[in-house]
Structures are given as structure tokens and as C-alpha cells.
Amino acid sequence: MKTVVITGGSRGIGAAAVRLFAGRGARVWFLYEKNHEAARAVARETGAQALCCDVADEAAVQRAFDAVGSADILVNNAGVCHYGLISQITPAEWRRLFAVNVDGIYNCVRAVLPQMLQKQSGAIVNVSSMWGQVGASCEAAYSTTKGAVLALTKALAQELGPSGIRVNAVAPGVIRTDMCASVAPEVMEGLRQQTPTGTLGTPEDAAQAIAYLADAPFVTGQVLAVNGGFVIT
């Protein structure tokens, strides 16, 4: 039985990944920051173990991974966004996005790596975004952090590959999650119309891609776009 750790697992893509891996018989732990009610609901539904942890807090992350023990798969899904002009983003907001979206991955990789190196085996899947590939107006900070995730993914794949550890990323497009709740309906409709498939994605779409990368033995350093063709590279 494989042990999977998923960050940001109380809702959206993270919760869908928890359900998918648990449904396939994995031993699942998920981290969440503050949505206790949602975390309890996901844990009850799936039998997964929930740990309250801000991934930007290095010490808290280490405590969480100490509780987990040895992990076979790490899914770095936790993330925050900010919508607004670059001139409107405060330094504190900018730093918070990097602390969660980039430093959070660094903290989790550092915490899980000793176990994976000892076993000479492991899989890491990072959740980026199509905006990390092409950028988005009024989402400069978010796009920048997600671009950093892609660069980190490729660098780690080269660094850790000789140790039997694969590192890949998914780059979701417009997915119907709480992160999109504040987006005006007409904007969402416009995005749907720009998507070649004529649909918006679901958390389950992204979770399926995550599960594939976690289990693909000859795939590393790759970015799997899950965007309905919105961005084709």
C-alpha cells in the first residue's frame, strides 16, 4: 500500500485527489490550512488523515511529515491567488503568494526527501497553472509563482532522477473550484467560449492527471496541461 501526502486537500483539486487516491487503496494524508469543517468532511468520506498545517511554515511542515512517516508520493497542491493590477498588489500580498505557492513546495520537498532518498524511490507532482506557462493579465503574482513551480519541477527532475525520484507538474486551466468563486459569471462564460472543448474543467479532471503522473514510471520533468486546449504549447 502506497502512502500519499497531498497539500491543500480539504477542497477543490486537492480534495478530488484525496478521494481518487483513497479510492484506489492508498494510505492518504492531507494537509490543510484553516478549513477545519471541510477537512473533517473529506477525512470522514475517504478515511484519509487530515493535518492542519500552513505549508509556508517550515517547522510546521516538518512536524506534519514526522507524523506521516515514510511517503511514496507527494502532491504539492496547496496554493493561493490574487487578482488585481500589479500596481495594486501590496508587498505583503506578493510575499504571501510566494510563501505558499513556491516556498510551500520547497518546504514539503525538503521534508519528504530524506525518506525518498533512503528508499531510492518516490514521485512528486506539483500543481502549477496554465498561467504559469503563458501569464495572465491582472494575475501577475500568481502567474509568476506558478511559472516558478514549473522551473522548480524541471530542475528537481534532473537533480533527483538518478535517485529514483520522479518529479512532474500538472498545469490546470480554468477549473470550477472555490478559487474561481469570485470570478464574475460573464467572465467564466467568456473563458468557456475560448476553450476549444467548449467546457470548463472539474477538480476530478486535474486529479486524474495527478494520479497518472504519480504512477508513470518513465515520465519525469514533464508538464501535463489540463486545460481543454485553452493553452497549446
What spans do the regions from the language model cover?
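Active-site helix of classical SDR
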Residues: 109, 145, 153
